[in-house]
Amino acid sequence: MNRRWNLVLATVALALSVASCDVRSKDKDKDQGSLVEYKDNKDTNDIELSDNQKLSRTFGHLLARQLRKSEDMFFDIAEVAKGLQAELVCKSAPLTETEYEEKMAEVQKLVFEKKSKENLSLAEKFLKENSKNAGVVEVQPSKLQYKIIKEGAGKAISGKPSALLHYKGSFINGQVFSSSEGNNEPILLPLGQTIPGFALGMQGMKEGETRVLYIHPDLAYGTAGQLPPNSLLIFEINLIQASADEVAAVPQEGNQGE
């Protein structure tokens, strides 16, 4: 199971562990916490909830929010609610934990394969259309493209040095998954340790240049890694220094003549 669902289930388990299998009386539950007015503008009537009820309802919202955020799993929310209620009174679940894990693994595998196929199709369609746009250069047909946003006049990248740069990585939909913008200074990146499309797409890039790379999943992470499977990756790169290795080898003023 992925980390998200482990976290969700762990949270639910923690909440359920606090509850007793004995059914509490409604009067006892009603007495917990001080009554504070709670108004939900989306409800037809104003209602009052105790602090305990507020916490309980908010926990339900947080759980539902996690379910709603999921792009790869589709739960029947009504059945989730029934499962919560049944567990609180110690009723048996339709599956054992082992059966659940096995079934979940099967479902996740099918969802993963479906998502991989969809993303690959989107990537290939994007590259095909993008190749028609002005200024787009194909390094490898249907696999790797770049577009220069700002020309540079300094030294050009050759091979796989450690380059000093700023970058922003995003998906086709514009969602940013990684960036150096949060740093107050550029990062030193050994190109020999990057994905193939990144290093290859930077060849010939000059200091001061800004270019955008469009990388097919075959030259990126494919179906491996933490990103969605077969994602096309888009990197906007501003090259500060083509080879920081050479700069590091130059003696500093204080060391000259020693």
UniProtKB/Swiss-Prot annotation:
Keywords, in A-Z order? Cell outer membrane, Isomerase, Membrane, Rotamase, Signal
Location of the PPIase FKBP-type domain: 160-243
Task: Determine if Electron transport is one of this entry's keywords.
Answer: no
Give one GO biological process term.
protein folding
* Gene Ontology terms: cellular component: cell outer membrane
Provide the family line: Belongs to the FKBP-type PPIase family.
State what protein this is by name. Answer: Peptidyl-prolyl cis-trans isomerase Mip
Protein source organism:
Chlamydia pneumoniae
